[in-house]
């Protein structure tokens, strides 16, 4: 909690239609996006963050958040932002309508850097690009275990200053 209290937010450089850009794309930098998909009926938010993963500490450079965008329209937004950020790697949550979004990115928009997960039974899911020869799926299937491990890793990265961000919505969540 003390780390969260010390975080300071800054206004984004650009803000338009749910997309807040804190740092513009830089050539030769690598980016990754984590995507969470909602139904677009005003309750939960469809959202993603763009993270510069070139060096440590990693830095959140952009964020999208909208609770009205329909799952059929969301892939186009993801695609455009990912392309602008040097063909960012995308990890999409595929529970419920997330699977539809990942499928549109892969098969309709033919996005090359969509990450996949290999299902390893009790060993869980392994993130990769689908070349493991194992049973793979587009994106990550969210479960209590995945959420718990992800939350603990996120907490550690924030506390150890390995992930930096200055977005108001992220800090308040």
Task: Report each predicted region and the residues it spans.
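Surface-exposed intrinsically disordered loops and tails
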Residues: 126-138, 173
């Amino acid at each position: 909690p003390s780390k969260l209290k010390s975080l300071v937010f800054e206004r984004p450089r650009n803000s338009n239609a749910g997309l807040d850009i804190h740092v513009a794309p830089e050539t030769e930098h690598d980016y990754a996006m984590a995507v969470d998909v909602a139904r677009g009926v005003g309750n939960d938010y469809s959202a993603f963050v763009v993270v510069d993963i070139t060096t440590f500490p990693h830095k959140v450079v952009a964020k999208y958040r909208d609770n009205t965008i329909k799952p059929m329209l969301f892939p186009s937004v993801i695609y455009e932002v990912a392309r602008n950020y040097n063909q960012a790697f995308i990890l999409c949550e595929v529970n419920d309508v997330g699977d539809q979004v990942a499928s549109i990115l892969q098969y309709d928009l033919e996005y090359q850097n969509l990450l996949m997960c290999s299902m390893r039974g009790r060993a869980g899911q392994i993130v990769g690009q689908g070349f493991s020869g194992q049973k793979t799926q587009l994106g990550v299937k969210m479960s209590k275990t995945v959420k718990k491990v992800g939350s603990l890793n996120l907490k550690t990265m924030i506390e150890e200053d390995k992930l930096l961000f200055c977005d108001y919505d992220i800090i308040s969540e």
